């Protein structure tokens, strides 16, 4: 694929030598739930904004870029390390759990133009997609992504599309029932949104198997042999010509690192990660129960260790996006 000089410039700002080692902290609903588990009452705006600032201050020196949201993360954008690029999220958090459609929705007071003016080097939008889902729902979702792609083209800024697969008939994505479908769901969605009419520059995707069911990665029930898991990663590489990066999906830092080694050995030429909770999740209970200073200490020690180890893994496993663009 080819991109404009401006888009290439911005992609270089969010990566290091073609590898995207990005820190994801655009969580809103999930972060509120994590905080609420350690205190009485809901998390306050100040609590959320402050933790985002702490993470940005302490960990962005070791990340090629950080993904934040404009609802609670604008203060954090101001304190990131000078060389660290910025992705801003464009979607509202969560989805309507009373329906299976999971239709996308933008932050209504924002546009790509405004996110760019706020300092974004790239735009990220999250889409829930069931490749086998209701045809009319999927047509709506495709049209929605076309609009965002057109906005990003008009502003000449990279479009990162985050795809989260699901099945309209299965409520638990961690279930064995969904694990059997996951390779098809993940790779099928990637194939759909690689069409150039969507204007996507980089895909942010799940690994195509649930590693908790892979032979050699679990002491419980196995739903993928090693060979089947390898095939899923190979099919993922074949599903798109676009650069793609992995999300950590809330798994532990150790499992995520092991997964990246497995993916690379299988032939997946991913160009980095947007890693969130696997890096910073442990700071949340410390921040809520012990305060800012202790949270900062955690980020400087365990948080740094998580991101430093991940960077070392990426050096050995990731392929530069420049090989595809």
UniProtKB/Swiss-Prot annotation:
Keyword annotations of the record: Lactose metabolism, Lyase
PANTHER family: SULFOFRUCTOSEPHOSPHATE ALDOLASE
Keyword Lyase: yes
Organism field: Streptococcus pyogenes serotype M1
EC number: 4.1.2.40
Cross-referenced Gene3D superfamilies: Aldolase class I
Name the record gives this protein: Tagatose 1,6-diphosphate aldolase 1
Pathway of action: Carbohydrate metabolism; D-tagatose 6-phosphate degradation; D-glyceraldehyde 3-phosphate and glycerone phosphate from D-tagatose 6-phosphate: step 2/2
Reaction(s) the record says it catalyses: D-tagatofuranose 1,6-bisphosphate = D-glyceraldehyde 3-phosphate + dihydroxyacetone phosphate
Molecular function (Gene Ontology), one example: tagatose-6-phosphate kinase activity
InterPro entries with a match to the protein in the record: Aldolase_TIM (IPR013785), DeoC/FbaB/LacD_aldolase (IPR002915), LacD_aldolase (IPR050552), Tag_1.6-dipho_adolase (IPR005927)
Annotated gene: lacD1
The family this protein is said to belong to: Belongs to the aldolase LacD family.
Pfam families: DeoC
GO BP: 6-sulfoquinovose(1-) catabolic process; D-tagatose 6-phosphate catabolic process; lactose catabolic process via tagatose-6-phosphate
């Amino acid at each position: 694929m080819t991109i404009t000089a401006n888009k290439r410039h911005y992609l270089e700002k969010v990566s290091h030598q073609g590898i995207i080692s990005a820190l994801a902290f655009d969580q809103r609903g999930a972060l509120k739930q994590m905080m609420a588990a350690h205190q009485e009452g809901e998390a306050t705006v100040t609590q959320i904004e402050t933790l985002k600032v702490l993470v940005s201050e302490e960990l962005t020196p070791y990340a090629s870029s950080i993904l934040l949201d404009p609802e609670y993360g604008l203060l954090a954008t101001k304190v990131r390390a000078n060389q660290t690029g910025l992705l801003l999220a464009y979607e509202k958090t969560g989805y309507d759990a009373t329906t299976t459609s999971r239709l996308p929705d933008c932050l209504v007071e924002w546009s790509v133009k405004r996110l760019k003016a706020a300092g974004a080097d790239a735009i990220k939008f999250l889409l829930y997609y069931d490749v086998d889902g209701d045809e009319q729902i999927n047509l709506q979702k495709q049209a929605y992504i076309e609009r965002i792609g057109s906005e990003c083209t008009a502003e000449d800024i990279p479009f990162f599309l985050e795809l989260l697969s699901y099945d309209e008939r299965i409520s638990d994505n961690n279930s064995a029932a969904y694990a059997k479908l996951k390779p098809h769901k993940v790779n099928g969605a990637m194939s759909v949104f690689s069409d150039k009419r969507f204007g996507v520059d980089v895909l942010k995707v799940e690994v195509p198997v649930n590693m908790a069911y892979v032979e050699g990665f679990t002491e419980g029930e196995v739903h993928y042999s090693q060979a089947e898991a390898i095939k899923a990663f190979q099919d993922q590489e074949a599903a798109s010509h676009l650069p793609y990066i992995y999300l950590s999906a809330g798994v532990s830092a150790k499992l995520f690192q092991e997964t990246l080694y497995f993916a690379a050995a299988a032939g997946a030429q991913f160009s980095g990660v947007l890693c969130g909770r696997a890096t910073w999740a442990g700071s949340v209970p410390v921040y809520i129960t012990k305060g800012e200073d202790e949270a900062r200490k955690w980020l400087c020690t365990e948080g740094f260790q998580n991101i430093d180890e991940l960077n070392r893994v990426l050096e050995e496993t990731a392929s530069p996006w420049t090989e595809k663009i």
